[in-house]
């Protein structure tokens, strides 16, 4: 007769381990354990039956998979954490004994770990890294404008700033930007890189006051990993475009004016951060390959799909060169870096006043300027050869894929609603009048391309009632729930439409009074 197994020695209980047990096994402190889990991508799990895992107890505990903890035990970074612990103990002892020579020697030999192998381990292919790029970009752009504090070092801010500027230069060079949206939280951007849609948010350029209730140690661990990951991604992206990495300016001409605003050693970095100069491309002897075009057989099965793909490519090429014929000047009060990034990503030329920032390419007095972006109701001196518009015109033009009329965006005018390009209305949802107008225009342009389909006759009320009565009880309950949710959605839509109607009436009354 075999030995009886005790409770908790088999089944689900052996698949999980509590956090305290994991700390004892790895011989780590809680902050080091958290840092290691973040770097390796290990997250807590919720067992299906806590009683079985916790030997009948229902106390709240954090659990991990046993396999994950065993995997962490073989991580090379774990040894570096232990070496760093020994280093701190020796350094503290040398300082207490007033041995500056020993302390300096220990500082020079401080243990440092690299995360290259972890990045390659978590992202076996480049596409895997691109799919996980959204959070990395949002975090790096956030820390790129953070002030230096006792928790945030200046070197971290500089690295985040450098990596974010390099990524923006790639987007400009490859014309990969697709959508922009100004929100209360920040500015949302969406780009398409190698078939992957990447969305990130950048904060507005204001002075940031870091909150005290945020654990910056956890956030800085994420930043540490994202910096290494972003370095690999930027190198690969630049290599695909045959550009130097780190980026090098294509035209290193006279910059005497630039040295008036920064040190000589910082000029090139500041000009790169201005996003207004092209980067140097590695010259290759390979000739540009031209894609052969073959006539489309109208009788083939894929004729419609091929034609639709061609039209989509033409539309995308037109979007990439949206501002190619625009020469834009930015006033002091507008968000310069954001607008430069947006306009140059679609082929436009941008500049600003020389005293505002480094990197200006032409002056305000240039007669070839087509648009000047302002954000104040009145201007001291106006040129008749250009349009004065508000910044929202740039974002709305990008989202609609065409240069919009400028009359609604003149200084002092009440701007049209800034609609989010990320919202996709489903059947029965509330659609604002402005969105309806855009959708109607798109339907008019595509009217000739839509093929006529056979109309399916609607069921009468009696036929619907008979069909519902013939349903099984389970299907009928599901049908009633669906109809109830649709009815609730319709009532909410009616409320929003009535609110919008009242708003439009009040707006019309104000216009009449002002006139």
UniProtKB/Swiss-Prot annotation:
To which protein family does this belong? Answer: Belongs to the pescadillo family.
UniProt lists compositionally biased (Basic residues) regions at: 484-501
* Protein's name according to its UniProt entry: Pescadillo homolog
Job description of the protein: Required for maturation of ribosomal RNAs and formation of the large ribosomal subunit.
Q: What GO terms in the biological process aspect are recorded for it? A: maturation of 5.8S rRNA from tricistronic rRNA transcript (SSU-rRNA, 5.8S rRNA, LSU-rRNA); maturation of LSU-rRNA from tricistronic rRNA transcript (SSU-rRNA, 5.8S rRNA, LSU-rRNA)
- Location of the protein in the cell: Nucleus, Nucleolus; Nucleus, Nucleoplasm
- Organism field: Nematostella vectensis
Q: Where is the signal peptide?
A: none
Q: Which lineage is the organism of this entry classified under, starting from the top rank?
A: Eukaryota, Metazoa, Cnidaria, Anthozoa, Hexacorallia
> Which SUPFAM superfamilies does this UniProt record tie to the protein?
BRCT domain
Which PROSITE patterns does the record associate with it?
A: BRCT
Q: What UniProt keywords are attached to this protein's entry?
A: Coiled coil, Nucleus, Ribosome biogenesis, rRNA processing
The record ties this protein, via InterPro entries, to: BRCT_dom, BRCT_dom_sf, PES
Could you give one GO CC term from the UniProt record? PeBoW complex
Name the major location: nucleus
An example Gene Ontology molecular-function term: ribonucleoprotein complex binding
Q: Where is the BRCT domain?
A: 318-411
List every stretch annotated Disordered.
477-515
Residue runs in coiled coils: 270-327
Pfam families the record matches: BRCT_2 (PF16589), Pescadillo_N (PF06732)
């Amino acid at each position: 007769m075999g030995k009886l197994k005790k409770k908790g020695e088999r089944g689900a209980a052996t698949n999980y381990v509590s956090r305290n047990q994991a700390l004892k096994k790895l011989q780590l402190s809680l902050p080091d354990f958290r840092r290691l889990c973040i770097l390796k991508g290990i997250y807590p799990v919720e067992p299906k039956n806590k009683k079985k895992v916790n030997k009948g107890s229902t106390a709240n505990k954090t659990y991990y998979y046993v396999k994950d903890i065993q995997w962490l035990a073989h991580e090379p970074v774990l040894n570096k954490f232990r070496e760093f612990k020994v280093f701190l103990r020796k350094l503290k002892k040398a300082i207490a004994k007033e041995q500056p020579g020993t302390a300096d020697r220990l500082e020079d030999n401080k243990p440092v770990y690299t995360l290259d192998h972890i990045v390659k381990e978590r992202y076996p292919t480049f596409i895997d890294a691109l799919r996980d790029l959204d959070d990395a970009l949002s975090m790096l752009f956030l820390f790129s404008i953070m002030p230096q504090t006792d928790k945030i070092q200046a070197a971290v801010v500089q690295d985040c700033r450098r990596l974010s500027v390099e990524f923006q230069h790639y987007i400009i060079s490859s014309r990969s930007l697709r959508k922009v949206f100004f929100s209360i939280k920040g500015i949302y951007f969406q780009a398409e890189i190698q078939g992957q849609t990447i969305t990130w948010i950048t904060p507005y350029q204001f002075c940031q006051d870091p909150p005290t209730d945020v654990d910056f140690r956890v956030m800085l661990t994420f930043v540490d990993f994202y910096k290494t990951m972003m370095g690999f991604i930027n190198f690969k992206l630049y290599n695909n475009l045959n550009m130097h990495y780190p980026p090098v300016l294509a035209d290193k001409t006279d910059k005497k004016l630039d040295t008036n605003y920064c040190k000589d050693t910082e000029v090139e970095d500041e000009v790169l951060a201005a996003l207004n100069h092209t980067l140097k491309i590695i010259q290759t002897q390979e000739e540009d390959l031209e894609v052969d075009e073959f006539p489309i057989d109208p009788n083939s099965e894929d004729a419609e799909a091929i034609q639709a793909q061609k039209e989509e490519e033409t539309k995308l090429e037109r979007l990439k060169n949206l501002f190619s014929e625009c020469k834009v000047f930015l006033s002091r009060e507008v968000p310069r870096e954001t607008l430069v990034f947006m306009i140059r990503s679609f082929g436009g030329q941008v500049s600003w006043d020389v005293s505002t920032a480094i990197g200006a390419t032409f002056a305000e007095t240039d007669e070839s300027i087509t648009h000047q972006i302002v954000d104040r109701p009145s201007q001291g001196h106006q040129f008749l050869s250009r349009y004065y518009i508000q910044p929202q015109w740039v974002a709305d033009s990008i989202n609609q894929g065409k240069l919009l009329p400028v009359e609604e965006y003149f200084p002092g005018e009440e701007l049209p609603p800034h609609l989010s390009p990320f919202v996709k209305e489903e059947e029965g949802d509330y659609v604002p009048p402005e969105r309806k107008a855009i959708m109607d225009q798109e339907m008019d342009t595509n009217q000739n391309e839509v093929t006529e389909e056979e109309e399916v006759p609607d069921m009468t009320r009696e036929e619907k009632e008979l069909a519902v009565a013939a349903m099984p009880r389970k299907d009928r309950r599901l049908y009633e729930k669906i109809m109830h949710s649709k009815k609730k959605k319709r009532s909410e839509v009616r409320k929003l439409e009535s609110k919008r109607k009242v708003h439009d009436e009040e707006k019309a009354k104000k216009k009449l009074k002002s006139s």
